[in-house]
Amino acid sequence: MKTRSGVVAAIAAIALAAVTLSGCGNIDAGSGAADDFERFMSEQKHIIGATGSGTNDLPWQGSPSGTVTVSADISADELETVVDMLGEYYVDHDRGNLDWKRMDVSVGAYELAVEKTKSTNDDLRALFEEIRENPRYTGGDIELREIRLEIDGEPSVDALERALDGSYDDLAAHFVEYVDIEGRPALTDAISVYFAEPGGSDQFTLQQFGEENRPDAEIAALRALWASVPLGFARVAENDFYAQTTDEADVPAADALVRGMLVGHEEGAIRIHGSDD
């Protein structure tokens, strides 16, 4: 049996441990780290805005993310300064109780992901500079696992197809080699090209996951569907076809048309809905 003094000592030890832990950092670690990110980045050169967000997964543990905004016409050298600083911040602050999900630089209509290693960031910046100097593209997201590129003009399947093929011609020499989360060699050759609806969200998208995986059958099906019924949304990749008709009444015929052209695709690989679904 514990003595009174033993119980008091145990309570004191617990209280001391709690005080010690609370002194180690913010109990709301994720949102706290996001606030710290915003404060620090807003004072740095070339940065005109900073936004952080975070989830507080457990007491003193969290998952923050952060984005800084720079001028759309920032020079390559100035962008290098910002990316290097972000990369160092990423390394210094991604530790035991904090699991940073991502950091990005917003440059006009583009989002450029930042990684922990300078060599990878240098390669991603070179890829980005190649993209933003090309009049084919008007915005997008550049990161290791996928390059998403917005194109301008009147939406059509032909325009999407030309942009997809052109993007591989434009960027093949600049794809970034890296090691994925499972330790396998990988390449930034997954590309999406898209037309955006007013307001900025993607409306019609072609995706290709590597130079050898062109979705020819799916493009043909999209072309036939486009000519058959009005569409409000479409996203097409190899073995994946999703579209929304503007009229719910067109769904059965649209579904039959696509399934008739993509025989052999799994049931869930083809999804046709009405825009109000």
Regions picked out by a protein language model, each given a short descriptive name:
Residues 40, 78-90, 160-171, 218-226, ...:
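Short amphipathic alpha-helices in soluble, non-transmembrane regions
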